[in-house]
Design a protein with these regions (language model features):
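Soluble extracellular-acting proteins and domains
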Residues: 16, 31-181
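N-terminal secretory signal peptides and thylakoid transit peptides that target proteins
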Residues: 1-18
Length: 181
């Protein structure tokens, strides 16, 4: 029987990529980023591989939410007024290690440029992701997923998107950044 080197290369490539495929399949929400980690290889995803629904990938950056507070979704308040109190970061993401995380508002976290108070801009990207979810700008994860990520980071020091994979604060910030336009 004639040799089929093309099939062997395909099978070999498949075996090498299987870890990536298994990782993506193990946490469905994390498989659906708007941009690949490199930000340019495969571009934006339009649909989830496990659903026929269109994936909404219109996430905005921390800078957008900082500069456009009038676009914040209902129930999220950038500043305190006579009618409502500004939404505190700790109300959504409790038990933070820094003063900013413990007492600051969502807007304070977006505005902060202090790496000691918001390492890797993790808090700013969490706030942006939270506002993106609440305003239906992204549909591939939920507030509950964001809260789990935060909980695991402060409890264990990392978030595990899949078995055997550990994302530390910088990794989570990079992932969340990849969901922003």
């Amino acid at each position: 029987m004639p040799s089929k080197p093309g099939r062997r290369r395909f099978a070999s490539a498949g075996a090498k990529a299987s870890g990536v495929i298994l990782t993506l399949a193990s946490t469905p929400g994390m498989a659906c980023v708007c941009k690949t980690p490199s930000g340019s290889l495969s571009g934006n995803l339009q649909t989830s591989s496990h659903s026929t629904q269109t994936v909404v990938c219109n996430g905005m950056s921390p800078g957008y939410w900082k500069n456009w507070p009038d676009q914040w979704p209902s129930g999220c308040y950038p500043t305190t007024t006579a009618y409502q109190t500004a939404t505190k970061f700790a109300t959504i993401f409790p038990n933070g290690a820094t003063t900013l995380y413990q007492t600051g508002t969502l807007m304070d976290v977006l505005i902060s440029n202090d790496p000691a108070q918001d390492p890797h801009n993790l808090g700013a990207h969490l706030v942006a992701a939270y506002l993106n979810v609440k305003s239906n700008k992204i549909s591939f994860f939920t507030v509950a997923v964001l809260k789990t990520i935060w909980h695991d980071l402060y409890t264990y020091g990392y978030y595990a998107p899949a078995a055997g994979v550990k994302w530390f604060a910088k990794d989570v910030a990079n992932y969340l950044s990849s969901t922003e336009n």
